[in-house]
Amino acid sequence: MKVAISACLLGLPVRYDGGAKPVSAVQKLAEKVNVTKICPETSSGLPVPRPPAEQREGRVWLKDGSDVTDDFERGSKIALNAVTSSDITLAVLKAKSPSCGVHEIYDGTYSGKLVSGEGTLTRHLLEEGICVVTEKTIENVRPSVEHPVALILGTGLGHLADLVKPVRRIDYRDIPGFPVDASPMAGHSFEATIGTIDGVPVVVYPGRVHLYQGYSAAEVTSLVQHAHHLGCKDIIFAGATGAVSGNAKTGLGVITDQINLTGTNPLAEWAGLRDVETPFVDMNDAFSPYLRTLARGVADDLKIELNEGVFAGLLGPNFETPAEVAMLRSFGVSYVGVSTALEVIMARALDMNVLALTLAANPAGAHGTTHKSVQEASEKYANDLERLVRGVLGLL
């Protein structure tokens, strides 16, 4: 995978004061990917050292009063060309910088105060559709024994649990909030495994319960709350779906957004929630752009076809009618299923980083679709899904 990274984060002395800002998590990522080092400020020809620069009223000023907007724009376009000419889809830039800041930058008073805004290079990269994050994102998603990655698996995908080098197993009946009388459906197992996959700490849940079985939204999302309680900050959902013809085709995909059509919401059951600060959760970028970009990069490297699109969560358990499929198509939906939607809402309420992978096992509403045929289709893509998940975990 190709990644552009701010040179200062890799330890190069290119900052205005002649120093660097090396970040261990970024350096570890750089060891696993094909890196293009960028620094728009030095690319512009600005000297090192120099006075600090900040944006103010749409211009970039040095602390000595010099207007260096044109220099920053020139350097940003040089860096942009280095990124686009190499077909790079991910850039890791220095937070708060007037050239590389993402969502917030210094306000131009040189007092350390931050305001909403983007660096000059960041704006250009975003316009090109490139995923831009700062070192804070890389540090936040880095797994550890204290912060393992959670994987919640759906029909026919529980085989991923076999990859785990186990340390401990947890019966679902011992998980707070999970229905003790529940029995796993075919293709599911109700025993979580704590351990590692290729050395990466994980907690794998190879089965779940659903609303259509009569369980509440709180019970359906109890595994997410349990993962959060165990310290998980990153969570990967993998489940079988139907592909909405015209918007998606069968095979592996990554979910970019969702529509909750289940008729309920776990945050509406406020009295039973643990660890959630507010039910009024921002669902913009509910599916981490960074994790999605990693998944696409891994898929490209491994030559795995990986589509993407919007997911619609329905109540089920019946498969979709032709009229429902037509409606979903008009909504811009690519994938439809009976899980994931509520779990993603809960994960975001708990401030977890979400990646949702899907196996579109059948065309939505197709004649002859059965639970068994979905399981059989899952087996067809089992190897590619395994390679994809292992590849993503390896980059965290």
Identify the function of each model-found stretch.
Residues S99-C100, D107-H124, E128, F190-V200, ...:
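Mid-sequence, gly/pro-rich, charge-dense loop/helix-turn segments that line enzyme active sites
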Residues V338-V374:
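Zn-dependent metallopeptidase/amidohydrolase metal-coordination segment
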Residues G19-T36, E118-T122, K165-A186:
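Short catalytic helix/loop segments, enriched in acidic residues and glycine
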Residues S43, A53-I78, A82, K113-V141, ...:
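Divalent-metal-activated hydrolytic enzyme cores
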Residues K21-L62:
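Short, surface-exposed acidic-centric catalytic microdomains
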